Regions:
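Extracellular carbohydrate-recognition regions
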Residues: 21-41, 216-221
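Extracellular beta-strand elements of beta-rich domains used
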Residues: 187, 207-209
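Extracellular/lumenal carbohydrate-interaction signature centered on repeated Trp-anchored short motifs
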Residues: 71-82, 156-159, 180
């Protein structure tokens, strides 16, 4: 019997090739909009919009879930930090995010790596804007132990505000999976509300990998 697959595993399995990134990979909103899309339950509506002179990606989930993803090998030895800016319209109060019924997030960014040739041999870290779990909390995905979630933001205190993030992917894999890794094989983002039939809008811009832990410059809220 094939073990349950994480959503990131499904994304990587839909592509037949891997591109290796050179330099410091940086993805503008225009570039993210060209990434492949994968539906899990209906379609999250992705659009390019302008906010305060910045072009950003808007993701509207109305009780559905689809992701934009890129399969690309990224060298974490040279660029271990992932950076991005995000904003959400609301959170989902009352969800137990450690359960299958509560596995919904107004915004999430994934990184993943292949650990073998078999389809389920993929490990992913999900950076999420949590509704109930506190900032800094981490937990195993309810659908598979090959996906770990890490709450970078939580609750409504910063709803409607742009927030800059920078996280050491190598350190997070060491903490969550107990192993040192030197590369990942894919990155993705999503706003989803399919399990609990909830709605939210998220905005993303400036996804990049860097040797520096410095925060990106976000649009003004």
């Amino acid at each position: 019997m094939i073990p349950s697959l994480s959503r990131m595993a499904v994304l990587l399995l839909t592509s037949g090739f891997t591109v290796t990134a050179s330099g410091n990979p940086h993805f503008s909103a225009d570039e993210i909009m060209t990434w492949s899309s994968r539906s899990f339950s209906g379609e999250t509506d992705y659009q390019l919009i302008e906010q305060n002179g910045y072009k950003v990606l808007q993701a509207q989930s109305r009780g559905n879930a689809s992701a934009l993803y890129l399969e690309q090998e990224i060298n974490l030895t040279n660029t271990p930090y992932i950076q991005w800016c995000w904003k959400v319209s609301n959170v989902y109060p009352g969800l137990d995010e450690t359960t299958k019924q509560g596995d919904d997030y107004p915004a999430r960014v994934y990184v993943a790596r292949k650990t073998g040739l078999l389809p389920w041999q993929i490990e992913s870290v999900n950076y999420v804007w949590a509704s109930s779990q506190p900032i800094g909390a981490d937990w195993i995905n309810a659908f598979t132990d090959r996906a770990h979630l890490l709450a970078l933001q939580s609750g409504g205190s910063k709803v409607g505000e742009w927030v800059a993030e920078a996280h050491d992917v190598s350190a997070d894999y060491a903490k969550l999976f107990g192993k040192k890794v030197d590369h990942i094989d894919g990155v993705a983002l999503m706003s989803d509300g399919d399990n609990a039939s909830v709605n939210a809008t998220a905005w993303f811009t400036h996804i990049a990998f860097s040797s520096s832990a410095s925060l990106p410059e976000c649009p003004s809220s």
